[in-house]
Protein backbone atom coordinates (compact mmCIF):
# COMPACT_ATOMS: atom_id res chain seq x y z
CA UNK A 1 0.00 0.00 0.00
CA UNK A 2 2.87 2.32 0.86
CA UNK A 3 4.35 1.82 -2.63
CA UNK A 4 1.00 2.67 -4.24
CA UNK A 5 0.74 5.92 -2.27
CA UNK A 6 4.32 6.87 -3.23
CA UNK A 7 3.55 6.03 -6.86
CA UNK A 8 0.39 8.18 -6.83
CA UNK A 9 2.23 11.12 -5.24
CA UNK A 10 5.03 10.80 -7.81
CA UNK A 11 2.53 10.75 -10.68
CA UNK A 12 0.77 13.81 -9.23
CA UNK A 13 4.05 15.77 -9.02
CA UNK A 14 5.11 14.77 -12.52
CA UNK A 15 1.66 15.58 -13.90
CA UNK A 16 1.67 19.03 -12.28
CA UNK A 17 5.18 19.81 -13.52
CA UNK A 18 4.24 19.96 -17.22
CA UNK A 19 5.37 23.21 -18.79
CA UNK A 20 3.19 24.85 -21.40
CA UNK A 21 4.56 25.13 -24.92
CA UNK A 22 2.91 28.38 -25.97
CA UNK A 23 3.09 28.76 -29.76
CA UNK A 24 1.75 32.31 -29.75
CA UNK A 25 -1.54 34.03 -29.11
CA UNK A 26 -4.80 34.77 -30.90
CA UNK A 27 -6.76 38.04 -30.98
CA UNK A 28 -10.11 38.86 -32.53
CA UNK A 29 -10.22 42.59 -31.80
CA UNK A 30 -6.90 43.66 -33.30
CA UNK A 31 -6.26 45.87 -36.34
CA UNK A 32 -5.51 42.97 -38.69
CA UNK A 33 -8.78 41.20 -37.83
CA UNK A 34 -10.64 44.48 -38.37
CA UNK A 35 -8.99 44.91 -41.79
CA UNK A 36 -10.10 41.42 -42.84
CA UNK A 37 -13.64 42.16 -41.68
CA UNK A 38 -13.58 45.35 -43.78
CA UNK A 39 -12.27 43.44 -46.82
CA UNK A 40 -14.93 40.75 -46.36
CA UNK A 41 -17.61 43.43 -46.19
CA UNK A 42 -16.29 44.99 -49.41
CA UNK A 43 -16.58 41.56 -51.10
CA UNK A 44 -20.15 41.23 -49.84
CA UNK A 45 -20.92 44.69 -51.26
CA UNK A 46 -19.69 43.49 -54.68
CA UNK A 47 -16.43 45.44 -54.91
CA UNK A 48 -13.27 43.78 -53.62
CA UNK A 49 -10.95 46.41 -55.18
CA UNK A 50 -10.11 47.73 -51.70
CA UNK A 51 -7.91 44.64 -51.30
CA UNK A 52 -5.29 46.27 -53.57
CA UNK A 53 -4.50 48.65 -50.71
CA UNK A 54 -3.58 45.72 -48.46
CA UNK A 55 -2.14 43.06 -50.79
CA UNK A 56 1.55 42.90 -51.66
CA UNK A 57 1.88 43.30 -55.45
CA UNK A 58 3.63 39.94 -55.90
CA UNK A 59 1.40 37.90 -53.59
CA UNK A 60 -0.17 34.59 -54.48
CA UNK A 61 -3.77 33.77 -53.70
CA UNK A 62 -5.33 30.33 -53.68
CA UNK A 63 -8.99 29.57 -54.21
CA UNK A 64 -8.91 25.91 -53.24
CA UNK A 65 -6.12 24.61 -55.52
CA UNK A 66 -6.38 27.39 -58.14
CA UNK A 67 -3.60 29.98 -57.89
CA UNK A 68 -4.17 33.64 -58.76
CA UNK A 69 -2.18 36.84 -58.71
CA UNK A 70 -3.60 39.99 -57.11
CA UNK A 71 -5.59 41.07 -60.18
CA UNK A 72 -6.92 37.56 -60.76
CA UNK A 73 -8.21 37.03 -57.24
CA UNK A 74 -9.80 40.49 -57.05
CA UNK A 75 -11.47 40.08 -60.46
CA UNK A 76 -12.63 36.60 -59.48
CA UNK A 77 -14.21 37.72 -56.23
CA UNK A 78 -15.77 40.76 -57.94
CA UNK A 79 -17.34 38.43 -60.52
CA UNK A 80 -19.35 36.70 -57.79
CA UNK A 81 -21.66 39.72 -57.60
CA UNK A 82 -22.41 39.30 -61.32
CA UNK A 83 -23.74 35.79 -60.76
CA UNK A 84 -25.12 35.89 -57.22
CA UNK A 85 -27.27 38.15 -55.10
CA UNK A 86 -27.70 38.22 -51.33
CA UNK A 87 -24.13 37.00 -50.80
CA UNK A 88 -23.55 36.52 -47.08
CA UNK A 89 -20.93 35.37 -44.62
CA UNK A 90 -23.13 33.73 -41.99
CA UNK A 91 -21.68 32.96 -38.55
CA UNK A 92 -18.50 34.83 -39.45
CA UNK A 93 -15.49 34.43 -37.17
CA UNK A 94 -12.34 36.49 -37.73
CA UNK A 95 -9.28 36.09 -35.52
CA UNK A 96 -5.55 36.66 -35.95
CA UNK A 97 -2.78 34.37 -34.75
CA UNK A 98 0.54 35.91 -33.74
CA UNK A 99 2.97 32.99 -33.64
CA UNK A 100 6.30 32.66 -31.84
CA UNK A 101 8.15 32.14 -35.12
CA UNK A 102 7.09 35.65 -36.21
CA UNK A 103 4.35 34.61 -38.63
CA UNK A 104 1.00 36.35 -38.47
CA UNK A 105 -2.14 34.88 -40.04
CA UNK A 106 -5.74 35.97 -39.88
CA UNK A 107 -8.34 33.21 -40.00
CA UNK A 108 -11.76 33.90 -41.48
CA UNK A 109 -14.39 31.19 -41.03
CA UNK A 110 -18.01 31.45 -42.15
CA UNK A 111 -20.89 29.85 -44.01
CA UNK A 112 -21.06 31.35 -47.49
CA UNK A 113 -24.56 31.71 -48.86
CA UNK A 114 -26.00 33.31 -51.97
CA UNK A 115 -28.79 33.09 -54.52
CA UNK A 116 -28.05 32.72 -58.22
CA UNK A 117 -29.20 35.72 -60.24
CA UNK A 118 -29.79 33.49 -63.28
CA UNK A 119 -31.22 30.22 -61.93
CA UNK A 120 -32.59 31.40 -58.58
CA UNK A 121 -30.92 28.47 -56.81
CA UNK A 122 -29.84 29.07 -53.23
CA UNK A 123 -26.45 27.90 -52.01
CA UNK A 124 -24.87 27.54 -48.58
CA UNK A 125 -21.36 26.20 -47.95
CA UNK A 126 -18.84 26.33 -45.10
CA UNK A 127 -15.75 28.35 -45.95
CA UNK A 128 -12.33 28.86 -44.39
CA UNK A 129 -9.85 31.56 -45.43
CA UNK A 130 -6.33 32.33 -44.22
CA UNK A 131 -4.77 35.74 -44.77
CA UNK A 132 -0.98 35.67 -44.34
CA UNK A 133 0.68 38.91 -43.31
CA UNK A 134 4.12 40.38 -43.96
CA UNK A 135 4.21 43.35 -41.59
CA UNK A 136 1.18 45.48 -42.57
CA UNK A 137 0.49 43.85 -45.96
CA UNK A 138 -1.22 40.62 -46.94
CA UNK A 139 1.23 38.49 -48.93
CA UNK A 140 -0.89 35.39 -49.49
CA UNK A 141 -4.43 34.17 -49.07
CA UNK A 142 -5.95 30.72 -49.11
CA UNK A 143 -9.72 30.13 -49.26
CA UNK A 144 -11.35 26.74 -49.11
CA UNK A 145 -14.98 26.36 -50.16
CA UNK A 146 -16.91 23.90 -52.28
CA UNK A 147 -16.62 25.66 -55.66
CA UNK A 148 -19.25 23.56 -57.46
CA UNK A 149 -22.02 26.17 -57.42
CA UNK A 150 -19.68 29.02 -58.30
CA UNK A 151 -18.27 27.16 -61.30
CA UNK A 152 -21.70 25.94 -62.46
CA UNK A 153 -23.28 29.38 -62.18
CA UNK A 154 -20.22 31.05 -63.79
CA UNK A 155 -20.55 28.70 -66.78
CA UNK A 156 -24.26 29.53 -67.10
CA UNK A 157 -23.45 33.24 -66.84
CA UNK A 158 -20.70 33.00 -69.50
CA UNK A 159 -23.08 31.12 -71.80
CA UNK A 160 -25.73 33.81 -71.34
CA UNK A 161 -23.24 36.48 -72.43
CA UNK A 162 -22.71 34.83 -75.84
Predicted regions, residues:
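Conserved N-terminal glycine/acidic-rich loop preference
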Residues: 39, 51, 99-117, 127
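Short, low-complexity N-terminal intrinsically disordered segments enriched in polar/charged residues
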Residues: 16-49, 53, 161-162
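Sec-dependent N-terminal signal peptides
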Residues: 4-13
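A solvent-exposed, acidic/Ser-Thr-rich amphipathic alpha-helical stretch
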Residues: 47-98, 104
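Hydrophobic pocket/interface hotspot
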Residues: 39, 50-52, 59, 73, ...
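Exposed beta-sheet edge and beta->alpha loop/turn motif
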Residues: 109-138, 142-145
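Low-complexity, intrinsically disordered terminal/linker segments enriched in charged
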Residues: 140-162
